[in-house]
């Protein structure tokens, strides 16, 4: 039995525990309570123990894309990344995805929901010990492309850790036909899609106008993105919809009626000038919602602390109410809320007996949040990757400050970025990528 203790333990599903402790063995939590009862074990002063953070929308394969197309409107930005992606192959995607997985663990993230072009994100997550769902992206008109995803899933499953589950990601309504959406859903695996992210998407589906027309083969339906999928029976509880910025009350009701989960990505939406999702209305409708960082292609980092702060600012600014989203509510969106969005709430997202021992220790030493008043607010507004001391997945150390540097991994990813910057476009390899031995 191993015990960790800290000034505060935040179970999320229960009341904060001052001078709390978490006991665990064999990958699961045995007990959560006062350190006076469980023992101190390894003690973290001026710190908080929280559930491992859950990032509900990532693209690990874009971990080195920072700055590409910055300042461009959504349509041209999309074109920039389509062109850049064609410059590298399978091994480079894997090198980049490994960096993305390492950055998640180093920032306290233990679980991800990733949309992966090559499948490299699944291998990287498995190698480095992340938990998650990695959905293989599909694009285009032909329903047969779902068979490509099926084959990729079959090729990858034997090399993956059991913590990583594979899914399928029909990219978006403007890049995937309804026939391919349906074929992808029929695979019977989790579904990740981008939905109602921008006004460009709305314009294109409505009447074929706007910059997306330069890259899309999909015939406009005359409907908004949510109504487009709903009209074809393509909404359901297996769907995790990233963004949902451009939605009205009727569309929110449709999402709720079909129990669609939403990944809320306020920094990405702000960086691309798309606006902010109506978080208050989405929450009021009872939707399952988790926070996601998206990728460094559209946001600076995989930092969920920054995402929590952005969610608070966006909610309060949009609603013009200082209580539109409290610190503890933002923390819930990055833990238990995101776990619900992934249908993993029985296993992760909160600290309790029988749950997976996915834990993050955050130090607030030297911060203006000490002495303590509200430990949840302190984590949300004072936390950062630099303050993460320890990240455990199934009770196994996957990051400890000062102990995991990943120098070789960083060099390989930097070399891949250099090729993204300078190599002439080629057809990217999407052959299965093998894990390191």
PLM region spans:
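Active-site beta-loop-alpha junctions enriched in small/polar residues
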Residues: 59, 117-118, 137-141, 169-175, ...
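Active-site microenvironment of metallo-dependent hydrolases
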Residues: 1-20, 25-26, 35, 332-437
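Histidine-centered catalytic micro-motifs
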Residues: 52-63, 190-199
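Active-site metal-binding motif and surrounding structural segment of the metallo-beta-lactamase
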Residues: 35-50
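Histidine/acidic residue-rich metal-binding segments in metalloenzymes
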Residues: 38, 123, 149-261, 273-289, ...
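Alpha-helical scaffold segments that flank or form the walls of functional sites
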Residues: 48, 66-129, 151-161, 415-419
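His/Asp/Glu-enriched, well-ordered alpha-helical/loop segment
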Residues: 231-235, 277-366, 382-385, 392
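Active-site gating loops and adjacent loop-to-helix segments of metal-dependent hydrolytic enzymes
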Residues: 64-95, 102-105, 128-129, 133-142, ...
